[in-house]
C-alpha cells in the first residue's frame, strides 16, 4: 500500500509565532536603518560646522572678539582690539559711575539726579577721624546713599610743625579701589565731586548732631574741612532722641539708626526746626536731601559707646576692616621695619611683635603721679614674653623681632626700650623726606603688620591696630592696662 507523505499542517499557535518573528525582524531592520541615518546626519553636521568655523575670515573674527575676563566688568563704551570693536570693561565702583563726570566748580553740578549721597566732617585726631569716616560710610550703606569722604585735616599734626601742614586726601592713605571692591559699594571722595582748585562757595544745609548729644558746647562741631571745600553750611539741630542715653551728660553718643531716620522724608518733615544762618552768606537752609550731611560722627554706635573694640562692631565689620593702606605706605612701613631689624630692604620682613605705648595726652587722665600711672617697660616686657610663648605654641612661629612705637619723648624711657633689645623705627628724616603726616602713617602700618600686637588700653590708635592685626594677620593681641601700680597684673 502506497503511503503519500503530505506537508505537515502548522497549528495556529505556530503560525502566530512565525508571524510575530517576521514582524520583529522587520522592526529591528527599520530601527537599524534609522540609527545609521542619524549617525550619518551627525557626521555630516559636524563636518559642515567644522568647515564653517575654520574658514579663515570667520575664525579670525571669532578669536578676536572673545571677551576679556574682568572682575566686576559691566557693559560700557567700546574699545578697539586688533581691529575689532569690543565693549570696554568698566569698574562699576569707579567714581565717575556715580557722578555726572569730572570734578566741577560747584559740587551740585556733578551729582546725578537719581542718586543720593552722604557726608560728614572730621573734628579730632587722625585715628579718631578714621573712625569718624568709617561711621559715616557705614551710615551711607544702611541708608542706600553713596558716601562722599572729605580729606584728613591736620588738627593734631600741626602741633609743633615748623610750617602749616596741608590736608591730605583719604585716598592718599587708604586703598579706595580695593575698599570698593571688598565692600561691593561705591565710595567717593570730595575731590571726585568738586574741583579742589574751585573758589566757588556752595550753600548747603546739614544736621547738627553735636549739640543734640552733649550739653557743654551750644553750637555744631567745628571743623576746617567745610572751609577747605568752600562750603557755607546752615545747620539744623537734630532732635534729642538721636542720643543713645537720653539726658546723660557724661556720654555724647548717637546711634546709627537714629541718624538713619533723619535720612528719610518723614523724620525730616517731623523734626525740622529753624536752621542756623550760614556763616558766610547768612542763608538758612533745611538739611539737604540729596547730599545728606552731619556735622560730626565720631560718637556714633550701634548699641554701646566706644564699641569699635567689640566683636560685633558694625562700623568695623562692614567698613573699617576693608580700609587697607595704599601700597606706597605699606612699602614704606616694610622698608622702615627691615632697617630697624637689620634686614636688607629687598628681603621679606620677618615675623614681629609691634608695641604701641601712648602717653602724651593720657597724662591728663592720671589721678596718681605719672611714674605710678603708666605701665613700666618691665610690665610691657612681660606681655611681650607671654605673647612670644603663645605664638610659638599656637602657630609654631619663633618671634625674635619686637618693635616699639610711642609718642613718649623722654630719652631715659627710650633707653629702657633699647635695653630690652627692642627695635624702633628711625623717623629722624621721615618728615623731611615724606611730610609731617608720615611718621603717624608709617607707625600705624607697622603696628598693623605684625603677627602680634601689644597696645595701650583706651587708645584708639591701639584699638585700630589690634583689630587690623587680628583681621589681616590672624595675629594675637593684648592691651596693657594702666592708671595705677599693678593695673596690668594678671
List each model region and its residues.
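Catalytic donor nucleotide-activated moiety binding site of glycosyltransferases and closely related
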Residues: 388-433
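A donor-sugar binding/catalytic signature common to diverse glycosyltransferases
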Residues: 440-487
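N-terminal signal-anchor transmembrane helix specifying type II single-pass membrane topology
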Residues: 2-68
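Amphipathic alpha-helical interaction motifs in eukaryotic regulatory proteins
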Residues: 134-137, 381, 385, 448, ...
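Short, aromatic/basic amphipathic alpha-helical patches
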Residues: 163-170, 411-422, 464, 468
Amino acid at each position: 500500500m502506497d503511503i503519500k507523505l503530505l506537508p505537515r499542517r502548522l497549528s495556529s499557535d505556530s503560525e502566530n509565532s512565525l508571524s510575530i518573528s517576521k514582524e520583529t525582524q522587520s522592526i529591528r531592520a527599520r530601527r537599524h536603518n534609522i540609527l545609521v541615518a542619524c549617525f550619518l546626519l551627525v557626521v555630516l553636521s559636524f563636518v559642515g560646522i567644522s568647515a564653517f568655523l575654520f574658514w579663515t575670515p570667520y575664525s579670525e573674527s571669532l578669536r578676536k572678539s572673545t571677551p576679556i575676563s574682568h572682575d566686576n566688568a559691566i557693559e560700557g563704551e567700546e574699545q578697539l582690539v586688533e581691529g575689532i570693536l569690543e565693549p570696554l570693561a568698566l569698574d562699576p565702583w569707579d567714581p565717575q559711575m556715580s557722578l555726572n563726570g569730572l570734578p566741577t566748580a560747584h559740587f551740585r553740578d556733578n551729582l546725578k539726579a537719581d542718586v543720593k549721597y552722604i557726608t560728614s566732617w572730621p573734628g579730632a585726631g587722625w585715628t579718631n577721624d578714621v573712625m569718624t569716616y568709617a561711621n559715616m560710610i557705614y551710615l551711607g550703606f544702611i541708608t542706600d546713599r553713596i558716601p562722599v569722604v572729605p580729606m584728613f585735616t591736620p588738627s593734631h599734626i600741626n602741633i609743633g610743625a615748623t610750617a602749616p601742614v596741608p590736608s591730605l586726601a583719604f585716598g592718599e592713605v587708604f586703598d579706595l579701589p580695593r575698599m570698593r571692591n571688598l565692600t561691593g559699594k561705591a565710595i567717593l571722595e570730595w575731590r571726585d565731586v568738586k574741583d579742589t582748585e574751585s573758589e566757588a562757595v556752595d550753600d548747603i544745609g546739614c544736621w547738627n548732631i553735636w549739640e543734640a548729644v552733649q550739653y557743654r558746647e551750644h553750637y555744631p562741631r567745628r571743623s576746617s574741612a567745610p572751609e577747605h571745600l568752600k562750603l557755607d553750611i546752615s545747620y539744623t539741630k537734630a532732635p534729642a532722641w538721636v542720643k543713645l542715653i537720653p539726658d546723660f551728660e557724661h556720654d555724647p553718643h548717637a546711634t546709627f539708626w537714629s541718624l538713619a531716620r533723619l535720612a528719610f522724608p518723614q523724620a525730616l518733615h517731623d523734626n525740622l526746626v529753624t536752621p542756623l544762618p550760614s556763616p558766610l552768606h547768612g542763608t538758612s537752609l533745611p538739611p539737604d536731601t540729596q547730599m545728606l550731611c552731619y556735622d560730626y560722627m565720631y560718637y556714633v554706635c550701634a548699641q554701646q559707646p566706644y564699641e569699635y573694640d567689640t566683636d560685633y562692631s558694625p562700623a568695623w565689620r562692614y567698613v573699617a576692616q576693608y580700609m587697607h593702606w595704599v601700597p606706597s605706605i605699606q612699602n614704606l612701613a616694610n622698608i622702615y621695619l627691615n632697617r630697624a631689624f637689620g634686614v636688607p630692604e629687598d628681603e621679606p620682613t620677618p615675623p614681629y611683635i609691634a608695641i604701641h605705648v601712648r602717653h602724651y595726652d593720657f597724662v591728663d587722665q592720671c589721678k596718681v603721679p605719672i611714674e605710678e600711672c603708666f605701665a613700666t617697660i618691665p610690665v610691657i616686657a612681660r606681655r611681650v614674653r607671654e605673647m612670644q610663648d603663645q605664638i610659638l605654641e599656637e602657630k609654631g612661629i619663633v618671634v625674635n623681632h619686637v618693635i616699639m612705637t610711642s609718642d613718649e619723648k623722654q630719652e631715659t624711657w627710650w633707653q629702657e626700650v633699647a635695653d630690652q633689645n627692642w627695635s624702633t623705627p628711625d623717623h629722624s628724616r621721615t618728615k623731611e623726606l615724606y611730610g609731617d603726616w608720615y611718621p603717624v602713617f608709617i607707625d600705624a602700618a607697622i603696628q598693623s603688620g605684625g603677627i602680634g600686637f601689644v597696645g595701650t588700653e583706651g587708645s584708639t590708635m591701639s584699638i585700630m591696630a589690634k583689630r587690623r592685626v587680628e583681621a589681616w594677620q590672624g595675629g594675637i593681641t593684648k592691651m596693657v592696662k594702666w592708671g595705677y601700680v599693678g593695673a596690668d597684673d594678671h
